[in-house]
């Protein structure tokens, strides 16, 4: 097994928390109360797990790079190396949305069919759920690794699909997915830093780090590029937290009762995850949905009310962006929703109405749509 990197430095993270508290008053208000008060108010872990993400991505890239030989062997043994096999990305809830952020880019990079499949569907409809073929690779994602569907689905596949190979990506070193299969040569377990195993209800660090860990499958022959991209993403992620937190806090004070998140391609997976986060963090008080920019016209627009927040993850690709801008302008022309929040780079100012908000993210387009999902879900 690959050598495990040292644990992410708590001192490094605390220095960052201090810096962001000093520079951004919104975070100062949250970080400054005594830890016991933060815990009583229920946000102690969530706050840190959101803010630490840019640094955890750097650690995850180093950690995954140590598994290079094992990952190359796994791709070869599963038939993906010579394009005979298929790739399935599985999990439940947010862990499934990890796969939805990755399937298109991994399919393009590996030149094999790649499908996100819910772990529960594998349990109930095994033969229909999996791509046809005798061999393939199944990647199982799990923050805790203890959900009954995840381990049960893996147990089932080990019995019924004996030629398949498996990759487990998990944040919990003591969970079932991390400990139960160590003796099986068909399974490689990649453990992320314990700091990514979110203690709060919602998945934040765990989600983005599992996305970024598995992104390496498509860049395993070019790890220098993988590390360079990680550095760019970490810098943009820090800038989002430093530059836009006041604006986002102001949005949160709006009295919206529902929210819809729009994304294209890989960003639709980010939209799904973001919608779930809003639903969970408001305890269901804000109803949420996610759609593609082109799909929202076909029925879901009827659910956009005067009290609906519309969040748009804008593509950096010219053709994709043209379709997205057309839809956003239609929303403005029809005066739909309470307000729009548009996240992107070089966003045209004519898109917005009074009350709308543009979150400019320099270098976002350079990171690429296929990698920006970790930024959209911060």
Q: Where do the PLM segments sit?
A:
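Active-site phosphate/pyrophosphate-binding segments
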Residues: 49-55, 60-77, 82-83, 181-311
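Extended, charge-enriched "interface" segments that sit outside catalytic cores
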Residues: 4-26, 32-33, 46
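Glycine-rich phosphate-binding loops that contact phosphosugars or nucleotide phosphates
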Residues: 4-12, 80-232, 313-364
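Acidic, two-metal ion nucleic-acid-processing modules in DNA metabolism proteins
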Residues: 36
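Short conserved micro-motifs at the rims of enzyme active sites and ligand-binding pockets
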Residues: 273, 322-324, 353, 369-372
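Conserved phosphate/anionic-ligand binding catalytic regions in large, soluble enzymes, centered on
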Residues: 42-46, 52, 89, 93-105, ...
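Peripheral docking tails and interdomain loops at the edges
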Residues: 7, 15-19, 356-378
